[in-house]
């Protein structure tokens, strides 16, 4: 299947342009995933509607780690590459630590509990066991924070599905290349 065509700026809905300009300012370019989603201003607003509140509760590194765990489960190479890049370049995380996050791991027990939980939620489609909740609670996460982790998981599921359905052309470097540059 061929990737969905990325429309030029002059063919992008006007209601999406301000958000895309924000992504361009942040990344230095408009990532293809957002150019794809921007074809529906409502879908782009839905993504942003989750992103802004979560930025206040989960730090950038945690959001990237969760994104990597969820994306690995979903086989979304675009998001794995994007969040590996973002994690190293913007969140200033160690590339090896990010690689561990892809599989639900971390050198920090509290972080590992959150990332592993997001992975488990994705694998089970939310039908986790009581022991899964016990592990994350025992690591110091409150129920409100656990809900925020579930929300981030759902946000990344949405982006993974867009990428997997439309075969979004990857415009981020391989994780190995990022690690070599860091």
PLM feature spans:
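Hydrophobic alpha-helical segments
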Residues: 1-182
């Amino acid at each position: 299947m061929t990737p969905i065509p990325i429309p030029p700026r002059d063919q992008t809905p006007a209601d999406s342009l301000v958000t895309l300009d924000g992504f361009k300012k942040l990344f230095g370019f408009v990532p293809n995933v957002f150019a794809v989603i921007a074809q529906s201003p409502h879908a782009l607003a839905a993504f942003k509607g989750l992103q802004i509140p979560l930025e206040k509760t989960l730090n950038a590194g945690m959001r990237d780690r969760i994104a990597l765990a969820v994306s690995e489960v979903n086989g979304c190479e675009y998001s794995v590459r994007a969040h590996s890049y973002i994690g190293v370049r913007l969140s200033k995380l160690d590339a090896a630590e990010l690689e561990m996050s892809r599989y639900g791991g971390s050198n920090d027990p509290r972080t590992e509990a959150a990332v592993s939980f997001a992975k488990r939620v994705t694998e089970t489609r939310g039908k986790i066991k009581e022991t899964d909740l016990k592990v994350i609670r025992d690591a110091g996460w409150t129920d409100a924070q656990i809900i925020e982790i579930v929300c981030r998981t759902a946000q990344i599921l949405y982006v993974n599905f867009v990428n997997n359905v439309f075969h979004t052309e990857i415009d981020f470097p391989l994780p190995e290349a990022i690690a070599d540059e860091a």
